[in-house]
């Protein structure tokens, strides 16, 4: 085995261990934020939505800067610094009794993610061969699902005693993750050349096809982020107990562990990436529309199952498509910018979703936020279809001219 192949194999295992620590640290804390501050402390959902949206927008919206800096200086210092900053954010969240302090803790957490998320994504693109990326992204998603359940179970158990224990556990896990990276991560360069920060950012911004694709995905993320805000609140309201939230993540884990990899393997042989992304988005949109009309936990979990199945179909295709469109000369910048759709969609999804949720309750129209999200998903589906049809038409035109 060549040294390059050996490095790739070792890199796969490193990425999987690192991902598990990050997922556990995140899901111990974040699914319980809405339960803690909305249901236990009586805050308006929009106040918590602002906090979650701020974290999302800072982490993903500034991702291009984190990625560009990592292109210049390498992945290791950015990842270690970012994880320590995330740990500080979680520690601050544990003592938050005013909205401004919760917002500040989410700001710290988001800035940490800005530093470590783009270089971690770029390492996947660097270490995993193109023909293997779809399957590897599926493995990461399976791991995400298992980690989400374990994290949510642990967080729910700790929440019975004290929310500060929840946040302290998340902080400790991110400190461990920082130490793991500081000790074992080699000083790898992310790109084929050491690209200056401004040049990497400029290269991305001139790629109109990539920019349009990323911005359109904002609508997809408006739906996806509700697993952190409105779906846990809805499960808690219907069940009457916050402990039921862990079953929502258990459903995701069961579906992911049993279906994700087989669906990815089968669909990559029979369908294009864009068709898989659009099919998953359509299922997510249609399953979200009736959520506000259900009154039983069984009906709600059935719709959540459909939503997760749509995500299982769409997410590996979305990740693989984003990676395939990235320029190897500026991987960090591309993977950082690819998070901008999540920044915009996440911020609007959290803040707008929280506001619509409160509005729906006040006017006795609980289905309002869910119907709006479903409509947004349908429009995003149509916009992606138009983009992909334009791309195919341009390709056919070039082939005919040649």
From Swiss-Prot:
It comes from the Bacteria. Residues 34-98, 160-164, 235-243, 298-299, 361-367 are periplasmic. GO terms for cellular component: plasma membrane. Residues 1-12, 117-138, 186-213, 265-276, 321-339, 389-402 are cytoplasmic. One of its GO terms (molecular function) is transmembrane transporter activity. It is found in: Cell inner membrane. CDD domains: MFS_MdtH_MDR_like. It holds the Pfam family MFS_1. InterPro entries: MFS, MFS_dom, MFS_trans_sf, MFS_Transporters, Multidrug-R_MdtH. SUPFAM superfamilies: MFS general substrate transporter. One of its GO terms (biological process) is response to antibiotic. The keyword Transport applies. The chain crosses the membrane at residues 13-33, 99-116, 139-159, 165-185, 214-234, 244-264, 277-297, 300-320, 340-360, 368-388. Keywords: Antibiotic resistance, Cell inner membrane, Cell membrane, Membrane, Transmembrane, Transmembrane helix, Transport. NCBIfam families: PRK11646.1. Confers resistance to norfloxacin and enoxacin. Belongs to the major facilitator superfamily. DHA1 family. MdtH (TC 2.A.1.2.21) subfamily. This is Multidrug resistance protein MdtH.
């Amino acid at each position: 085995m060549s040294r390059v192949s050996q490095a790739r194999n070792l890199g796969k295992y490193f990425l999987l261990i690192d991902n598990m620590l990050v997922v556990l640290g995140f899901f111990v804390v974040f699914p319980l934020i809405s339960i803690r501050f909305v249901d236990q402390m009586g805050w308006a959902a929009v106040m918590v939505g602002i906090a979650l949206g701020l974290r999302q927008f800072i982490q993903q919206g500034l991702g291009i800067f984190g990625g560009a800096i990592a292109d210049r200086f390498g992945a290791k210092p950015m990842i270690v610094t970012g994880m320590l900053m995330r740990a500080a954010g979680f520690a601050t969240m544990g003592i938050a009794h005013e909205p401004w302090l919760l917002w500040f803790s989410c700001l710290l957490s988001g800035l940490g993610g800005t530093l470590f998320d783009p270089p971690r994504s770029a390492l996947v693109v660097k270490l995993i061969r193109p023909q293997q990326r779809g399957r590897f992204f599926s493995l990461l998603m399976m791991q995400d699902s298992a980690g989400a359940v374990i994290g949510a179970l642990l967080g729910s158990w700790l929440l019975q005693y004290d929310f500060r224990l929840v946040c302290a556990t998340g902080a400790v896990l991110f400190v461990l993750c920082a130490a793991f990276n500081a000790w074992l991560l080699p000083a790898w360069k992310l790109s084929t050349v050491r690209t200056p920060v401004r040049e990497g950012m400029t290269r991305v911004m001139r790629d109109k096809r990539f920019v349009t694709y990323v911005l359109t995905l904002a609508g997809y993320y408006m739906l996806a982020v509700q697993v952190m805000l409105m779906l846990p609140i809805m499960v808690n309201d219907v069940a009457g107990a916050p402990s039921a939230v862990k079953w929502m993540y258990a459903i995701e884990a069961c579906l992911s562990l049993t279906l994700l990899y087989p669906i990815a393997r089968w669909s990559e042989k029979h369908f294009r990436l864009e068709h898989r992304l659009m099919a998953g988005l359509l299922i997510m949109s249609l399953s979200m529309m009736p959520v506000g009309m259900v009154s039983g936990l069984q009906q709600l979990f059935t719709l959540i199952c459909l939503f997760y199945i749509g995500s299982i179909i769409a997410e590996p295709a979305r990740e693989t498509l984003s990676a395939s469109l990235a320029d190897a000369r500026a991987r960090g910048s591309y993977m950082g910018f690819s998070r901008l759709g999540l920044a915009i969609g996440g911020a609007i999804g959290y803040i707008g979703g929280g506001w619509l949720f409160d509005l729906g309750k006040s006017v006795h129209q609980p289905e309002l936020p869910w119907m709006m999200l479903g409509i947004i998903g349908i429009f995003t589906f149509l916009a992606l279809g138009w983009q992909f049809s334009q791309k195919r038409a341009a390709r056919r035109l070039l082939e005919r001219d040649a």
